[in-house]
A protein has these predicted regions:
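Active-site microenvironments in enzyme catalytic cores
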Residues: 2-134
Length: 134
């Protein structure tokens, strides 16, 4: 059974406040054992709205859980996607303010800066054509 709109709002607000206060919260999958991918993306959408309303700017998207090992660990069978905001980027040489994070970690990411849009099923060639640089 899908989460209710109230449960989605509670989950999104919990995540939003955890980021602001830099305090851990429990796993949403424990709080809401019936949660599924569709619910997770609804929570993400509600969280994105909160962040945009707080003044953050959407800068891009990311694909996560691309390795089979991580998918197996989380009991999912497809990669997920996430939103990148302007406060998530640091330039070479920047000092990263560790106090901003609950648990400071650095993860290298490969970024594709796009010059065109992609939608639906696309070919490798279409991705290359839409990519400005990586």
């Amino acid at each position: 059974m899908p989460l209710t709109e109230n449960q989605i709002e509670v989950a999104a607000e919990s995540l939003f406040q955890a980021e602001i206060s830099r305090k851990r919260i429990g796993l949403l999958s424990v709080q809401f054992p019936e949660i599924d991918m569709e619910d997770a993306y609804k929570i993400q959408a509600a969280l994105v709205e909160k962040k945009i309303n707080s003044g953050l700017k959407l800068e891009g998207w990311k694909i996560g859980l691309t390795s089979k090992a991580m998918q197996d660990a989380l009991k999912i069978d497809i990669p997920d996607s996430g939103i990148l905001f302007d406060n998530m980027f640091f330039k070479s040489g920047d000092e990263i303010p560790t106090e901003r994070f609950i648990q400071t970690r650095i993860e290298a990411e490969i970024a594709f800066c796009m010059k065109g849009s992609l939608a639906g099923e696309v070919t490798r060639e279409e991705v290359i054509q839409a990519t400005d640089y990586a």
